[in-house]
Amino acid sequence: AGIINVHLGDSPRCMDLIEQVIDETEIPASQFLPTHVNRNEMLFRKAITYALKGGAVDFTGNEDIDYWETICDEVRVCNGMKRMLDAGVNPNRITISSDGQGSLPIYNKQGEFLGMGVGQSSCLLKEVKECVERTDIPLEIALSTITSNPAEILNLKGKGKIEEENDADLCILDQELQMIEVIAKGKTVYRI
């Protein structure tokens, strides 16, 4: 069975329709992966409740973290993850994704459109680093949000863990959590 990746917006209904489907049908929470759960505080609080019931949730990482927190009122990923973990959410049910190569409109504080940016997948490692350095989330938990957790939740066989018979996809980091080498299917594709 597939997974439905639900992109959440600013609607005051938040996750109500997902919860209605789960409550009123035979479709389990494991079939849904709501993303952008850190879009605003109200949605984020609903996401905590949803995750405490066993649902998986996905934070959207951003390259310009301060902009999205201060101008757009998003819940900063590291702060949101810390709050979820402190609330008792299973860390294996949390992922971070990017809007890599997606369009990102840029607004000022008055909500006026200033231009268009492009989402970067490089934000994932930046968000993991913030989780570790700003909120003391253990590195293995922070890393799992972009490795083993999405692979498990999305049923990606051979991905997400270093195990025999899995694809040999690795990112080697230095002490400052900077990427120094990338190995894809056992072959080095990037090295500083």
Predicted regions and their residues:
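Active-site core of metal-dependent hydrolases
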Residues: 1-107, 113-114
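Short secondary-structure transition/capping segments
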Residues: 17-18, 70-73, 108, 152-154, ...
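Context-gated lysine
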Residues: 46, 53, 82, 109, ...
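His/Asp/Glu-enriched, well-ordered alpha-helical/loop segment
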Residues: 86-166, 170-172
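C-terminal cap of metal-dependent C-N hydrolases
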Residues: 161-192
